Amino acid sequence: MKEFFATCPKGLENLLADELTTLGAEQVRETVAGVHFKGELAIGYKACLWSRFASRIVLVLSEFQMNDDLDLYLGAHTIPWEEHFSGTSTIAVDFTGTNPAIRNTQYGALKIKDAIVDRFTKRGHVRPDVDKKAPDIRIMAHLGKGKANITLDLSGPALHQRFYRQGTGEAPLKENLACAMIARSGWAGEPMMDPMCGSGTLLIEAAFIAADMAPALRRERFGFDRWLQHDSELWQSLMMEAQVRAKRGMQRCEVKLFGCDADPRVLMKARDNAKAAGVAHLITFKQADVTQLENPLPMPAVVEGEVSQEEARQVGMLISNPPYGERLGEFPALLEVHQALGDALRRGFQGWRVSILSASPELLSCLRLRADKQYRLFNGALECQLRNYQIALDSVASQKEVAQDFANRLRKNLKTLEKWASKEGIDCYRLYDADLPEYNAAIDRYQDYLVVQEYAAPKDIPAQKTRQRLLDMVQAAIKVTGMDGEKVILKVRERQEGKQQYQKLAAEQHRMEVQEYGARLWVNLYDYLDTGLFLDHRQTRRMLGQMAKGKRFLNLFAYTGSATVHAGLGGASETTTVDMSHTYLNWAQDNMRLNSLVGRQHKFVQADCLKWLSEADDQYDLIFIDPPTFSNSKRMDESFDVQRDHLLLMQHLKRLLAADGTLVFSNNKRHFKMDLAGLEAAGLKAQNITSKTRPKDFERNQHIHNCWIITHAEAPAEA
């Protein structure tokens, strides 16, 4: 009796153990990501041919205590390798695990290879060569818990490969995981549907099961082909038996399988895969997204008075592995997909059983279905849940609105602000700003896009609860506004005093043009925490435009230069835009070009604003400065705190401000206190105009910013 080991993805061990027992294996014992078993050679062959869950089947050659590299070498050297392959065969050694003596897997593999070669050489045999890509014999070794385990691979290419793939979607489901989903769903051959079938893996594997087709029947190469102990006669008899079973199974197979996908290119690959697998006649493919999902089974005719149409309707099994996204920004569109799937199931699949795999419990919750069972599976290293549901016969598509209080508030805000924005001539505004404490986020509208920015929740609120509320908000926002889920951008930021550090989120570029009181401005909704336009300063920018005619304008800490655009359009004779960021200064120039504001009268300076201010000596009639609340950038020589340093800032600006000039000073420091006495001593006076610069969509947030007009003491302050 030989000892074997079958590897598998985590979560499949129990299924694999039962399968091996059914094949005739003895002393079956589960471990993490694998199953030990014993049997005659035929059992090893059957496992290679028939296992739907295994990744590899290996023959255990030796297991021994190992403390250092010498133990590994000697243990490998004692194995009678010449009984397993000849010197003319090529070999590869795969090694996993480390200890203080074997600190990397390459070294472990090298010691075993040396032991093999030395044994062949000492016995006067030709030494085998190494071929890492396509060896005749693959030796696999694992080091763990002080023991080395050396095995010979019988599988060849990994057993999840069925050799029917002609092409795949972006993230193909491995075949053994697909089989685990089918097994855990409880499918018993009834009609099956995959509404997001991708390359068709689930449906093709289901067809193999229904037709009693061995999963490895199509492969041409196994790891034992060049093994000296290979029994070709035994193997051929097992293959012939499998072929007969497949032929008979296909003849009597009447299973109904249905697959849908929104992508016609992926669907074409699914059809090609099914054809290559020999099961195309069992699967009906249709291009459709989940919003178009329909029950593929016909509604039967019934005799009035006997049974209802719903009771007579044929039911089936729906199994799917919807996309679950690993990046936060993908979630809004995926929420919409899962919500639509749940609605479709309640609307048209009454009585069906449903099994959905996802790495996101939050997305599964968007189905609004109660699971009967739940299983833990792994898609590669990603932990997933497989949830089984039963759609009630009397279920209906309409459900209680998600986050109803939030949805009602958003609906109210939308009704008020949409009309106001249209009248004002703006197409981006704040729609919601943590109006309800339990829904702690800001939602900004940019034309037909929504940007949802989550604020950090208090530490005493569980992260899972916070996450679920955020996803509920996104779901409700999509429904209330009618926005496409793909045009909802989700961001996470902490509520801080002042502006955030401008953190880059991605390398991609997504620019779009928006309108603001006649100004055309570029915004980027995806790539930064901020979009390039601070909406709360909209009235301030408009005011600057109205004040700018014929004036020399300076914009310090200019960000993307939107205030400069308004000043330029307002007729400023010249503008100077200063910012430390090369990225934002280029953005400012793009904004100016978009409004045909070009020429030498418009200057752009990349510099540390505080250092530039201390050295500048030009005069300006209108100055706008909106510094950060706090900054300690690597490019700055020292830190800046707006509360601590604003008086020094004003003293520098006084030197640049023309005798009858106006300085507009704004910041986002909550509870900022202007040093009026210090200003007076410096020969300046200030007027608080915050209430005049706070736009309608920020009326609820009294501390979003504060704004001041500052002039020389002898000049009248402008309102």
UniProtKB/Swiss-Prot annotation:
What's its EC? 2.1.1.173, 2.1.1.264
GO MF term list: 23S rRNA (guanine(2445)-N(2))-methyltransferase activity; RNA binding; rRNA (guanine-N7-)-methyltransferase activity
The entry's cellular-component GO terms read:
cytoplasm
What PROSITE patterns does the record point to?
THUMP, UPF0020
User: Which controlled-vocabulary keywords does the entry list?
Assistant: Cytoplasm, Methyltransferase, RNA-binding, rRNA processing, S-adenosyl-L-methionine, Transferase
Q: Origin, by domain of life?
A: Bacteria
Which compartments does it reside in? Cytoplasm
Q: Which reaction does it catalyse?
A: guanosine(2445) in 23S rRNA + S-adenosyl-L-methionine = N(2)-methylguanosine(2445) in 23S rRNA + S-adenosyl-L-homocysteine + H(+); guanosine(2069) in 23S rRNA + S-adenosyl-L-methionine = N(2)-methylguanosine(2069) in 23S rRNA + S-adenosyl-L-homocysteine + H(+)
Q: What class of enzyme is it?
A: transferase
* Domain THUMP: residue ranges: 43-154
Please give the PANTHER family that the UniProt record associates with this protein. Answer: RIBOSOMAL RNA LARGE SUBUNIT METHYLTRANSFERASE K/L, RIBOSOMAL RNA LARGE SUBUNIT METHYLTRANSFERASE K_L
The record describes the protein's role as: Specifically methylates the guanine in position 2445 (m2G2445) and the guanine in position 2069 (m7G2069) of 23S rRNA.
Tell me the protein's name.
Ribosomal RNA large subunit methyltransferase K/L
> What is this organism's lineage?
Bacteria, Pseudomonadati, Pseudomonadota, Gammaproteobacteria, Aeromonadales
List the gene name: rlmL
